[in-house]
Amino acid sequence: MRVLVQRVAHASVVVAGETIGKISRGLLLLVGVTHTDSQNDLEWMAKKILKLRIFEDDEGKMNRSVEDVGGAILAVSQFTLYGDARKGNRPSFLEAARPEQAQASYQDFVKMLKLLGSVPVETGQFAAHMEVSLLNDGPVTLMLESPTKEEK
């Protein structure tokens, strides 16, 4: 599982001209799922993101989590995080999970964020063409990847 985490002042997602998800201060998550992701990967990632200390404290140090600052999360599915453009000029998406698996995993991940966390969680629409708007705060952007079985 790969998640691109962006600290934002605000973010929103629009589908067919309608805003379907919107947050103020918090985290925009672009969420990618691969074939081998398990429930353990989803839970690990949800816990990591909820506790990730990338918001500044009173001394300007990254010492607070999204929960600590009363922020929110906007989670958007993004299969292109598994794009491989090492060969040729058109990316291959063979490492991305099939849509059925990816949708179920994405939905389970969002449920875990809501269950394990204490912050509002908004979402995009799976497999839709989305217009995602954000105002980066920092900018602070991190790419997280769940540990491989060897790393666990």
From Swiss-Prot:
Subcellular location: Cytoplasm
Pfam families in the cross-refs: Tyr_Deacylase
Keywords: Cytoplasm, Hydrolase, RNA-binding, tRNA-binding
Catalysed reactions, semicolon-separated: glycyl-tRNA(Ala) + H2O = tRNA(Ala) + glycine + H(+); a D-aminoacyl-tRNA + H2O = a tRNA + a D-alpha-amino acid + H(+)
Protein EC: 3.1.1.96
UniProt main location, coarse: cytoplasm
Classification via InterPro entries: Daa-tRNA_deacyls_DTD, DTD-like_sf
MF (Gene Ontology): D-tyrosyl-tRNA(Tyr) deacylase activity; Gly-tRNA(Ala) deacylase activity; Ser(Gly)-tRNA(Ala) hydrolase activity; tRNA binding
GO biological process terms, semicolon-separated: D-amino acid catabolic process
Coiled coil spans: none
Intervals of motif Gly-cisPro motif, important for rejection of L-amino acids: 138-139
Gene Ontology CC terms, in alphabetical order: cytoplasm
Similarity comment: family membership: Belongs to the DTD family.
Function summary: An aminoacyl-tRNA editing enzyme that deacylates mischarged D-aminoacyl-tRNAs. Also deacylates mischarged glycyl-tRNA(Ala), protecting cells against glycine mischarging by AlaRS. Acts via tRNA-based rather than protein-based catalysis; rejects L-amino acids rather than detecting D-amino acids in the active site. By recycling D-aminoacyl-tRNA to D-amino acids and free tRNA molecules, this enzyme counteracts the toxicity associated with the formation of D-aminoacyl-tRNA entities in vivo and helps enforce protein L-homochirality.
Name the UniProt record assigns to this protein: D-aminoacyl-tRNA deacylase
Organism: Chloroherpeton thalassium (strain ATCC 35110 / GB-78)
Name of encoding gene: dtd
